[in-house]
Amino acid sequence: MPKMKTHRGAAKRFKKTASGKFKAKNAFTRHILEKKSAKRKRQLRGTAVVAKEDTPKLKELLPYL
């Protein structure tokens, strides 16, 4: 059986936490920021934990992470 390959796009976007969850940067922070309130932009800073329903797919994409 050949080695499994890491999905490079996913590897750049997601990090695994010590408990096995995945975290990623929040969306909607790149452009069209003028109409977004300061509160909304502040809350979008940092990272978000990926939903548990999406975790099995990420484990497939990132087998060695």
Swiss-Prot record:
GO terms for molecular function: structural constituent of ribosome. Keywords: Ribonucleoprotein, Ribosomal protein. It holds the Pfam family Ribosomal_L35p. Coiled coil: none annotated. GO terms for biological process: translation. GO terms for cellular component: cytosolic large ribosomal subunit. Belongs to the bacterial ribosomal protein bL35 family. NCBIfam families: rpmI_bact (TIGR00001). HAMAP family: Ribosomal_bL35 (MF_00514). PANTHER family: 54S RIBOSOMAL PROTEIN BL35M, LARGE RIBOSOMAL SUBUNIT PROTEIN BL35M. This is Large ribosomal subunit protein bL35. It comes from Heliobacterium modesticaldum (strain ATCC 51547 / Ice1).
